[in-house]
Swiss-Prot record:
GO biological process: translation
GO molecular function, one term: structural constituent of ribosome
Organism: Shewanella sediminis (strain HAW-EB3)
Annotated region described as Disordered, given as residue ranges: 1-22
One Gene Ontology cellular component: cytosolic large ribosomal subunit
Family: Belongs to the bacterial ribosomal protein bL27 family.
Protein name as annotated: Large ribosomal subunit protein bL27
InterPro entries per record: Ribosomal_bL27, Ribosomal_bL27_CS
Highest rank taxon of the organism: Bacteria
Pfam families: Ribosomal_L27
Keyword terms, alphabetized: Ribonucleoprotein, Ribosomal protein
Keyword Magnesium tagged: no
Length: 84
């Protein structure tokens, strides 16, 4: 009789759920106050004019207007602002 030994249990086969990070509203898009602009880990993008920052570094609009991305400062940081 042909026999095959039972396979051992594997220690792989797990992965974490994706966190859906990234830019949610792009440059030139209209936003309403409270709209999320970017979900991020750390400050990859910094809050500019009329943009608030949540405790998980989420950037959101404080006023209605259009999204503007800009690079400024001595460290060439990326800022996101809302233009009324």
């Amino acid at each position: 009789m042909a026999h095959k030994k039972a396979g051992g249990s594997t220690r792989n086969g797990r992965d974490s759920e994706s966190k859906r990070l990234g830019v949610k509203r792009f440059g030139g898009e209209s936003v309403l106050a409270g709209n999320i602009i970017v979900r991020q880990r750390g400050t990859k993008f910094h809050a500019g004019v009329n943009v608030g920052i949540g405790r998980d570094h989420t950037l959101f609009a404080l006023t209605d207007g259009k999204v503007k991305f800009e690079v400024k400062g001595p460290k060439n940081r990326k800022f996101i602002s809302i233009e009324g």
